[in-house]
């Protein structure tokens, strides 16, 4: 079986695709599937149409049995050809705007199978099917999420012994991730021993080292699909404070050291205080395994879906 994975062009990453797409592809490869990648270049909706010829050339070269497009707009490029069956994964951005939702949903009806990374994304899609779909979050590569003993990690990173370090789950400038809410909550604590770090421009291994060293991972986000950064924090057994959006509450479960906060800065302050007082590691990694959200298991489910589609041809 040969599968071509498609996503939006991101020049700052290897193979010009978001890391989780590559990680999923490599996990699929372990199940005996031949995998290749195609990045949709250009800006704006028109680029998804104009890239059709480039995609057809890639199809001619690679001869895939199936195409798996990540994000609805990439799915538009994929279904502009009818030679190869298409699976499309919706991650969240498809439902954030009216026109994006309409376009992504409309073109998704031309795919053979839909994957939604969380139930709320299926619920929000304007046009949806009653069958040939699954709710399946992306998995976490436990081989990449390496746990380092906390004190060793802190020494290697040069962390100060009298500081409490919080890793914010995104770039400070990303308004959707909502750093101002975290800052407002921390300011209410009136503590000078807290330092917040930005998750930006870091490799998976760097993130794992920081998560192993940090006292807390914070994600006061306004909107998500099924957040990979949160799953990585869980896989590194880092205490977590996060808002109840998307599937976050389900992911965190009732694991000790996981705290759900509201959008009230006072509640954020209270949960941050509790998480810092927890002063231990969680069993988040066990929770990831319990949910079946390792990359290997998610890849196995995808290969089963691919096989079903090809057997119906």
Each PLM stretch: what is its role?
Residues 69-74, 90:
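Short His-centered aromatic/hydrophobic patch
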Residues 254-266, 273-278:
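Conserved acidic donor-binding segment of nucleotide-sugar-dependent glycosyltransferases
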Residues 239-242:
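Short hydrophobic beta-strand element within catalytic cores of glycosyltransferases
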Residues 159-177, 183-186:
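Conserved donor-binding/catalytic core segment of Leloir-type glycosyltransferases
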Residues 99, 140-156, 162:
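Acidic anion/phosphate-binding donor-loop and adjacent secondary structure
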Residues 209-214:
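Short alpha-helical donor nucleotide-sugar binding micro-motif in glycosyltransferases
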Residues 222:
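Aromatic "clamp/platform" in nucleotide-sugar-dependent glycosyltransferases that forms part
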Residues 277-311:
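A charged, aromatic-enriched C-terminal amphipathic alpha-helix characteristic of glycosyltransferases
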